[in-house]
């Protein structure tokens, strides 16, 4: 149970950092100057980050439900 809580804490911290560090979309012409191609093209990077964030959110909720069930039972 301690290991599951640790994973849950790490996922929550990582989600908060991803959400805060992402560059907002549709900034106008200034977004062309600030976009970087660290992981390939900006579209594929954005798609990867969207999918990765969605997977982390789903895993966060599943771990939270499991921890809640474990605290109710035991």
UniProtKB/Swiss-Prot annotation:
<keyword id="KW-0812">Transmembrane</keyword>
<dbReference type="InterPro" id="IPR004692">
    <property type="entry name" value="SecG"/>
</dbReference>
<keyword id="KW-0653">Protein transport</keyword>
<comment type="function">
    <text>Involved in protein export. Participates in an early event of protein translocation across the chloroplast thylakoid membrane (Potential).</text>
</comment>
<keyword id="KW-0150">Chloroplast</keyword>
<keyword id="KW-0472">Membrane</keyword>
<keyword id="KW-0811">Translocation</keyword>
<dbReference type="Pfam" id="PF03840">
    <property type="entry name" value="SecG"/>
</dbReference>
<dbReference type="GO" id="GO:0009306">
    <property type="term" value="P:protein secretion"/>
</dbReference>
<keyword id="KW-0793">Thylakoid</keyword>
<protein>
    <recommendedName>
        <fullName>Probable protein-export membrane protein secG</fullName>
    </recommendedName>
</protein>
<feature type="transmembrane region" description="Helical">
    <location>
        <begin position="54"/>
        <end position="74"/>
    </location>
</feature>
<keyword id="KW-1133">Transmembrane helix</keyword>
<keyword id="KW-0934">Plastid</keyword>
<dbReference type="GO" id="GO:0015450">
    <property type="term" value="F:protein-transporting ATPase activity"/>
</dbReference>
<comment type="similarity">
    <text>Belongs to the SecG family.</text>
</comment>
<dbReference type="GO" id="GO:0009535">
    <property type="term" value="C:chloroplast thylakoid membrane"/>
</dbReference>
<keyword id="KW-0813">Transport</keyword>
<feature type="transmembrane region" description="Helical">
    <location>
        <begin position="1"/>
        <end position="21"/>
    </location>
</feature>
